Design a protein with these regions (language model features):
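Bacterial N-terminal signal peptides that target proteins for export
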Residues: 1-6
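Short glycine/proline-centered loop/turn elements that form peptide/ligand docking sites
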Residues: 149-150, 161, 167-176
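Surface-exposed, glycine-biased beta-strand/turn segments
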Residues: 19, 32, 47-129, 158, ...
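A short hydrophobic beta-strand segment most commonly corresponding to one strand
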Residues: 177-189
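A generic structural motif
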Residues: 110, 146-149, 166, 186
Length: 242
């Protein structure tokens, strides 16, 4: 059971959970490895007057698939350091491919765009979106997509297509971009936690460089400090529109 899953169980079930001394949740990470060459070997055997020589061989080391990848491809993209009002980020680079940052399961897909400017319901402001829960226990949210390339229940690996950057939801009134949020999963449909609970830039920066920086510990720590966030969000007036 992941640290995030245990914290969610305690918060939702309203039971006491005694914590041992703080430890970091185990995170499956795979460092990028440069292929290496095994030393060449030459073996000679002699039987009577006949000598047999084995040709030197080389063996390339296995290069594991990265645990995390930069989730935007096909365009140069940019992003700031903060988002107004809460912890998330907007990524700019219209038409960029949006891909899975890690392995996991697609849990929510919305292909309609119910946002109405006159009402401006924050539950619908994301337009077309995709949410996935990584095998690391973290939830990843991509909003304002144009085309969507996946379905609910799809199992994805790092780099699998989720959609393209677009201008749906309240992005119709602004610049084409993708809203990227990182949070923990909630047991019921909501939008307040889903939109983002930690700042993504340092993770995007690392993944862009091929570094395997996991948000698991930060997400777990934030959940521990806000154990009622999911329950509060579920009771919000517009939760059913999320």
């Amino acid at each position: 059971v992941s640290r995030i899953g245990l914290l969610l169980f305690c918060a939702v079930a309203s039971v006491g959970c005694t914590s041992q001394s703080p430890t970091s949740a185990p995170v499956a990470t795979a460092a990028l490895t440069t292929p290496t060459t095994a030393p060449a070997t030459t073996t000679s055997t002699t039987v009577g007057d006949t000598a047999t020589t084995l040709t030197p061989t080389t063996t390339a080391a296995f290069v594991p698939t990265p645990t995390y990848v930069f989730p935007f491809t096909g365009r140069n993209v940019s992003y700031g350091t903060r988002h107004a009002g809460y912890q998330a980020i907007d990524v700019f680079g219209c038409g960029a491919n949006v891909v899975a940052p890690t392995s996991g399961t697609v849990t929510q897909v919305r292909t309609t765009d119910p946002w109405e400017p006159a009402i401006n319901d924050p539950a619908t402001s994301g337009g077309h979106y995709v949410t996935m829960i990584g095998d690391d226990g973290v939830r990843y949210y991509f909003a304002h997509l144009g085309a969507i390339s996946t379905t609910e229940g799809a199992i994805v690996v790092p780099g699998d297509a989720l959609g393209t950057m677009g201008q749906t939801g309240d992005a119709r009134a602004t610049e084409c971009h993708t809203h990227f949020g990182i949070s923990w999963p909630c047991p019921t449909v909501e939008w307040q936690v889903r939109r983002g609970e930690i700042l993504p830039p340092k993770y995007l920066d690392a993944w862009r460089l091929g570094q395997q920086l996991s948000p698991t510990d930060e997400v777990a720590a934030t959940l521990a400090s806000s154990p009622n966030a999911c329950a509060d969000a579920a009771h919000a007036k517009s939760a059913t529109n999320a």
